[in-house]
């Protein structure tokens, strides 16, 4: 091809525009030619900036080209790349907050979902921050599996020029606390990258520690990336920044109204499962099938009194919470977690109380985790009667965090409502009833017509296929059925032609078949192509959903060969693992593969987002 510049309408166009009729005047052409020596990353930035301007109707006194060219010319070449590995949205939220804070500091920044980031590009980066949650037993979140594996492989590039930071999110009650964050830290270091800030491992109540780490990280990054002449950051039009941004968030929830909390298990069931409907009218809140609803709850006032009695407090003592003076009773009800315990809490109370039993337990980490996972605060305090001040009690406690529930409705069906399937956590301790915090709030204490603070947590790792002709296989025992009610409503209202197969399981057919009438209706209409159930206590030998999958191995494999998407929702500890092994066994048996090849095949489905899980 000829490199000769083409003259059109009296304008000399840059070589990249050769052959195109230019709508630009001479001054604009001259300005545009100034970008010819920009780096690829700067060109990408300018491209995105121009696109944003093209979508905005707002006029500007400054020509877009002049504004963009002067801004990029003044900015240093370096940028901060933020990558989030997120399962439920917490890591994504921290990453988005970091992005906004970086912009406010004038730092060039770009944000990536781990599933959209090519690991080989790390070789071209100068500064990267990874925000990583941990899934299951130390596993990477679904959106980060590929990047996690790539960094361990021989294909991973050497990274001598990369400086990085890692923030891990997790739950210290679990053995593999923040394991994914630790993994990324280790992998990057082995590839020759240098940490510019020490990794932080954040617990369940991560807001304060994450905010402090972000501030420190940006102070270090700003020094490194602002060596050139500083210029004002050129923002995309506000409409572009706000696109897709939630009106209400974890920090600013919406005060919705409880419409109903109806028990949907039988009178003789050993479980209390509620169908909960919440009114969102006028909020403008939207959600998609697969998303979760965050619920801020209040603890039981009666339970707060029991806790206070254990440590010799009346409840009127004052404590300072975020600069606000509250009675200790009010603080326990609305600000702190009192329906569970954790290893750090047990260890602290062991020191305060001098309990020999607890001090011995602290030395045995496995037993400590098991104890903390099965013991509420009030029962921990009962181990040894110990008087505490209000400040000492608060020092034992984690901050209250919202609970996430898989949404059980589609807005194409219920409009300005959101539905949940809530299993009441309920058990006995020495003859006394214990209840879960959020489930007890929704099922027992919150009255119809009262307000409940909520927000939508998007889950891009659990979404219906865009193609309505693709078959889907859904595995959701117990309350894991919730998102599949949403899926079926959505496919019904979209007129989707793809086949739908549901595997459901619980204890008994007569008492625990959640939404039975709805599933029978969908089965009769043909929308639900196939329904297989496993009720574990309806026969002498217990039967579970994974066995139903194996019994239908040939047909499951046929659907997979037809491009079916696989979805699993529910218990992560046993069910999800057993179902995963069932899918591997199907691939091994029907696909005539070795066990290792079958495992790789199923994991490849996960990477391709054809095998998605919402487990807890």
UniProtKB/Swiss-Prot annotation:
NADP(+) binds at residues 536-537, 542-546, 578. One of its GO terms (cellular component) is cytosol. Pathway: Sulfur metabolism; hydrogen sulfide biosynthesis; hydrogen sulfide from sulfite (NADPH route): step 1/1. It comes from the Bacteria. Binds 1 FAD per subunit. InterPro entries: CysJ, CysJ-like_FAD-binding, CysJ_Proteobact, FAD-bd_FR_type, Flavdoxin-like, Flavodoxin/NO_synth, Flavoprot_Pyr_Nucl_cyt_Rdtase, Flavoprotein-like_sf. Keywords: Amino-acid biosynthesis, Cysteine biosynthesis, Electron transport, FAD, Flavoprotein, FMN, NADP, Oxidoreductase, Transport. Pfam families: FAD_binding_1 (PF00667), Flavodoxin_1 (PF00258), NAD_binding_1 (PF00175). Residues 80-218 form the Flavodoxin-like domain. GO terms for molecular function: flavin adenine dinucleotide binding; FMN binding; sulfite reductase (NADPH) activity. It catalyses: hydrogen sulfide + 3 NADP(+) + 3 H2O = sulfite + 3 NADPH + 4 H(+). Residues 251-465 form the FAD-binding FR-type domain. FAD binds at residues 339, 373, 403-406, 421-423, 427, 436-439, 616. CDD domains: SiR. FMN binds at residues 86-91, 133-136, 169-178. The keyword Metal-binding does not apply. PANTHER family: NADPH OXIDOREDUCTASE A, NITRIC OXIDE SYNTHASE-RELATED. Alpha(8)-beta(8). The alpha component is a flavoprotein, the beta component is a hemoprotein. Component of the sulfite reductase complex that catalyzes the 6-electron reduction of sulfite to sulfide. This is one of several activities required for the biosynthesis of L-cysteine from sulfate. The flavoprotein component catalyzes the electron flow from NADPH -> FAD -> FMN to the hemoprotein component. Belongs to the NADPH-dependent sulphite reductase flavoprotein subunit CysJ family. In the N-terminal section; belongs to the flavodoxin family. HAMAP family: CysJ. This is Sulfite reductase [NADPH] flavoprotein alpha-component. It comes from Vibrio vulnificus (strain CMCP6).
């Amino acid at each position: 091809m000829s490199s000769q510049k083409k003259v059109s309408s009296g304008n000399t166009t840059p070589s990249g525009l050769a052959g195109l009729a230019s709508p630009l005047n001479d001054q604009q052409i001259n300005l545009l030619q100034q970008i010819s020596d920009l780096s690829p990353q700067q060109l990408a930035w300018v491209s995105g900036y121009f696109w944003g301007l093209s979508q905005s109707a707002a006029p500007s006194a400054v020509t877009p080209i002049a504004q963009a060219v002067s801004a990029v010319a003044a900015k240093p070449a370096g940028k901060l790349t933020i990558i989030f590995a997120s399962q439920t949205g917490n890591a994504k939220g921290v990453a988005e907050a970091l992005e906004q804070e970086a912009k406010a500091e004038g730092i060039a920044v770009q944000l990536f979902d781990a599933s959209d980031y090519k690991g080989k590009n790390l070789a071209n980066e100068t500064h990267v921050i990874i925000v990583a949650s941990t899934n299951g037993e130390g596993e990477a979140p679904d959106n980060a599996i590929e990047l996690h594996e790539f960094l361990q492989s021989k294909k991973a590039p050497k990274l001598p020029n990369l400086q990085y930071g890692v923030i891990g999110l997790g739950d210290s009650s679990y053995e593999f606390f923040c394991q994914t964050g630790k993994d990324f830290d280790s992998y990057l270091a082995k590839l020759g990258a240098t940490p510019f800030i020490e990794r932080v491992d954040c617990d369940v109540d991560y807001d304060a520690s994450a905010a402090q780490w972000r501030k420190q990280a940006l102070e270090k990054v700003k020094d490194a990336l602002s060596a050139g002449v500083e210029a004002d950051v050129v923002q995309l039009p506000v409409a572009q920044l706000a696109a897709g941004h939630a009106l209400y968030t974890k920090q600013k929830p919406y005060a919705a109204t409880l419409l109903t909390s109806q028990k949907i298990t039988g009178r003789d069931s050993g479980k209390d499962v509620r169908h909960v409907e919440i009114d969102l009218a006028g909020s403008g809140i939207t959600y998609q099938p697969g998303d979760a609803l965050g619920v801020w709850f209040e603890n039981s006032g009666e339970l707060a009194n029991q806790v206070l009695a254990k440590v010799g407090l009346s409840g009127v003592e004052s404590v300072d919470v975020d600069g606000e003076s509250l009675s200790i009773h009010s603080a326990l009800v609305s600000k702190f977690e009192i329906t569970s315990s954790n290893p750090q809490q047990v260890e602290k109370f062991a020191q305060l109380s001098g309990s020999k039993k607890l001090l011995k337990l602290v030395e045995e980490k496995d037993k400590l985790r098991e104890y903390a996972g099965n013991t509420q605060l009030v029962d921990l305090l009962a181990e040894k009667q110990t008087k505490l001040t209000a400040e000492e009690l608060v020092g034992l406690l984690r901050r209250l965090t919202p609970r996430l529930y898989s949404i059980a409705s589609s807005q194409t069906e219920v409009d300005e409502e959101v539905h949940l399937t809530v299993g009441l956590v309920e058990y006995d301790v020495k003859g006394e009833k214990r209840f879960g915090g959020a489930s007890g709030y929704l099922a027992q204490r919150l009255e119809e017509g009262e307000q409940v603070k909520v927000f939508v947590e998007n889950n891009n790792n659990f979404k219906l296929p865009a193609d309505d002709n693709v078959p889907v296989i859904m595995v959701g025992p117990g309350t894991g059925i919730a998102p599949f009610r949403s899926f079926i409503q959505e496919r019904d209202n979209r007129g989707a032609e793809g086949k739908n197969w549901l595997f459901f399981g619980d204890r008994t057919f007569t008492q625990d078949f959640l939404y039975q009438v709805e599933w029978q209706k969908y089965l009769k209409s043909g929308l639900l192509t196939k329904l297989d159930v496993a009720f574990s206590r309806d026969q002498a030998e217990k039967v579970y959903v994974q066995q139903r999958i194996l019994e239908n191995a040939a047909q499951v494999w046929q659907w997979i060969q037809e491009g079916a998407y696989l979805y699993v929702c529910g218990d992560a500890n046993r069910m999800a693992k057993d179902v995963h092994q069932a899918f591997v066994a199907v691939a091994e048996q029907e696909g005539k593969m070795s066990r290792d090849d079958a495992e790789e095949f199923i994991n490849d489905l996960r990477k391709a987002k054809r095998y998605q899980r919402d487990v807890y």
